[in-house]
Amino acid sequence: MLDSVPGGALRDYLSVPLVDKGSDIHSLPLLSLDFETSGLDAKKDHIVSAGYVAIEAGVIQLSSARHELVRLDGALTEHSVVIHGITDDDVSAGEALEVVTGNLLRALAGKTMVAHHAKIELTFLTQACQILYGMSPRFPVIDTMRIAKRWLERRNKHIEQGDLRLFNLRKRYGLPMYQAHNALSDAIATAELLQAQIGHMDSSKTLPLRQFLS
């Protein structure tokens, strides 16, 4: 695949080997990612902002935190503005999709993606790569929502509507409130949730990456 990829951010990402799935989660480099979008359909909607932060050996690296707005040509819907608070003026001053995606891919190289309800991040990042590069790799991902769902199901816990939302899962683990629907705040909140989930597992055992991948 690498030979057919032109130089640039995607090639840089692909040139770094994926992490061994047997490696212990405690020692692995991760990147917690969140997108705010104009809607839920990656074919017709757009990434509005991207927030991400690295996790190295179980420690959230706040110095690596990044939040970027994506420049859009069209107007945002009133519904999406109410949710994420990003206005047309904000996105008109943002960076091009190519710049934001390139920065993200370089940050993600050699790391495993972490996201909450990762389907959103995966589908929109895949679509962005298709638009920009004509192709997209498969991105290994740890989905904190799926980890929580499996944990509850194994204990025969009834899952109510809303139980798997990031805000409610953080409450379950005693984590503090945070500013929801801001891409960087959500990315940091997701990183903290993953740390809490790992912390409630048997720390005396190796926890291989494959156990966490969606």
Predicted segments, located by residue:
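Short, glycine/acidic-enriched loop or turn micro-motifs at the edges of active sites
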Residues: 35-39, 146, 189
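Acidic, divalent-metal-coordinating active-site segment for phosphoryl/phosphodiester hydrolysis
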Residues: 182-193
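Conserved non-catalytic scaffold segment of RNase H-like nuclease domains
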Residues: 2-139, 160-181
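Short alpha-helix plus adjacent loop in nuclease-associated cores
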Residues: 142-160
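Short, amphipathic alpha-helical segments that act as regulatory/interfacial helices
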Residues: 126, 191-198
